[in-house]
């Protein structure tokens, strides 16, 4: 079952935060609960993807994506992901998550997310390839960025994806 209570918490916590620009980091905090664990008593890989959702959805609101998507009756879908699990996250461990826009091309937006444990080690990292979709199919992300901020161009795609502390 999708964690609706956690989503409600994220909406309440983030509704009064100021908006962020492209490339700025949205930071959120989560806890690894016992029901998030697998047989080895660490964060289940599938639940980790759900936690990334919980970081990405408020990010979409703060960055202006949600407003443009709702106004135009579009949607945003994840078209691919490259994930790395680096360190174990155990029960009741506090997780700091960072989310940011990396770049975009004519079809996709690339979003980077990372999870950090209490020792300030990167516990997990993912890069999503997201598509904005309308009635006629995939929408060029530049249209979304033009509505958020005029004349905004994508950063250079190569060598931008990194983990920062």
Language model features: what each stretch is:
Residues 59-103, 125-131:
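Hydrophobic beta-strand-centered segment that forms part of the acyl-chain substrate-binding groove
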Residues 120-124:
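Residue-level signal for glycine
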Residues 108-112:
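Short aromatic-glycine-enriched beta-strand elements
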């Amino acid at each position: 079952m999708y964690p609706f209570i956690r989503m409600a918490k994220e909406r309440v916590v983030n509704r009064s935060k100021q908006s962020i620009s492209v490339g700025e980091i949205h930071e959120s905090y989560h806890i690894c609960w016992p029901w998030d664990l697998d047989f080895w008593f660490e964060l289940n890989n599938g639940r980790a993807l759900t936690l990334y959702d919980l970081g990405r959805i408020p990010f979409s609101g703060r960055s202006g994506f949600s407003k443009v998507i709702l106004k135009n009756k579009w949607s945003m879908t994840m078209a691919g992901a490259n994930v790395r699990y680096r360190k174990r996250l155990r029960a009741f461990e506090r997780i700091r998550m960072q989310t940011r826009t990396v770049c975009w091309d004519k079809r996709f937006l690339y979003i980077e997310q990372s999870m950090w444990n209490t020792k300030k080690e990167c516990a997990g990292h993912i890069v999503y390839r997201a598509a904005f979709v309308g009635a006629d199919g995939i929408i060029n992300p530049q249209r979304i960025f033009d509505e958020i901020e005029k004349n905004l161009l994508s950063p250079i795609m190569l060598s931008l994806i990194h983990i920062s502390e």
